[in-house]
Amino acid sequence: MRKLFSFGRRLGQALLDSMDQEYAGRGYHIRDWELRKIHRAAIKGDAAEVEHCLTRRFRDLDARDRKDRTVLHLTCAHGRVEVVTLLLSRRCQINIYDRLNRTPLMKAVHCQEEACAIILLEHGANPNIKDIYSNTALHYAVYNKGTSLAEKLLSHHANIEALNEEGNTPLLFAINSRRQQIVEFLLKNQANLHAIDNFRRTALMLAVQHNSSSIVSLLLQQNINIFSQDLFGQTAEDYAVCYNFRSIQQQILEHKNKILKSHL
């Protein structure tokens, strides 16, 4: 079992690295030859040129480039508020997908373009659409430490318990991403403390796995169940022992002793 945890630790670090590549707020990789004239104008934020293109060919309003990105996707990824407003006033498709099933709202959140995201939400963008990884806009806000964006999404009825393909709610995702401020924010907004992922790992197990003693402390204060077992019958305390995280093991042990004393 110790070997399994050792492997899990290396795998966990690899996953963190790959997560940073996938979820960090980067825009689209743009090649000029993939774009139409209207796409180029939108990326530059040239609202007058975009309007000129639409006057000539109105059907270009939702035109896709060679990677299935619409004008609105590209505009949101680059934070071109004036062009976003223009496109919405012309009634472009607001919940349209790109090749990864991401909507313009997802892309605005992914790239941390808050002004664009707010405009989209105020025009009725759906915050609960999932991409090919089953992530929602809230998952991307969580990864990019966006409490302001997360709050805005929740105020527009984003599902705080949405599951991605790994079974992670935004809370579990925040713990996996080591985002303590977001963890605190989600708990204050009534996120389910007892959520489990596809391996039946609890929030506490994930916090232990990532050696996040401050998040462990926060979860213990919330009286999370320390006796829950994952798919392999391991508890959060077992995780601390196998990873040799002695200070976290001590935190859990002290909490366990308090529970046992209260039942005497």
Swiss-Prot record:
SUPFAM superfamilies per record: Ankyrin repeat
Superkingdom in the source lineage: Eukaryota
Ranges of the ANK repeats in the UniProt entry: 67-96, 100-129, 133-162, 166-195, 199-228
Gene label: ANKRD19P
Name the UniProt record assigns to this protein: Putative ankyrin repeat domain-containing protein 19
Keywords: ANK repeat, Repeat
Signal peptide bounds: none
Record SMART domains: ANK (SM00248)
